[in-house]
């Protein structure tokens, strides 16, 4: 009931051949999703990953990670704190087909918390790469502590981005320096430098 109509951003583009089939499919899919309380999670995740790689839309991607972390973290996970936040972020970014996430990438200036290394050998038209500096504050930490971690993350991300090893790895993409600060399981800072 679908026809292949070309390619778009390394994906096969499928179209519905006519209006009658379109209405039948749409009604069937919508009814099925409502009856079974299903979500579009894998589709949305793929769309967010594509937006990150091709359009530089980083904020929705990290908001998605924060939402998943908040939704799926158990009490035991919350007790692990920083280790859980870092591990969860790495696990989600590892599912992104356009990047190889490198945790604590060594640069001449220290260790980048998370470097999203673009897979340019496979996806030649990716135009964005990312350094993510993650910071964690305990749930009871003050706003002053959050600001201190934010400034520390800015300093580190700027330093790492200028290193020779990072510059070689990102060519020819545009490097985004992202800082993320969590207070407990809540993302309180997410900004680009």
Residue ranges and their predicted role:
Residues 1-155, 159-161, 191-193:
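Extended alpha-helical interface modules used as scaffolds for assembling large macromolecular complexes
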Residues 165-193:
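Domain-level recognition of nuclease-like catalytic cores that cleave nucleotide substrates
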